Amino acid sequence: MKTKITELFGIEHPIIQGGMHHVGFAELAAAVSNGGGLGTITGLTQGTPEKLANEIDKCKSMTDKPFAVNLTFLPSLTPPDYPGLVDVIVVKDV
């Protein structure tokens, strides 16, 4: 099936996994991507830029298909390292 979504993301099916806190790890993202959709790693679930970088590398080792990283910006008294997380996503070319 070809749609604007499949063409834009280079996927087989117009299915995009949403970011899901506490379960958005490489295993789920790779399974969705390998099934023809666009899998998604949930950035804040990883906790730190280093852990996110490791999770992206893990996903890349599990699939050669496109996948995404969801990064939700939430108000917080002690926010996570958003600049570091964004840098990892850019450097890892996701």
Q: Would you name each region that the model predicts?
A:
Residues 1-94:
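Active-site entrance/lid segments in N-terminal catalytic domains of soluble metabolic enzymes
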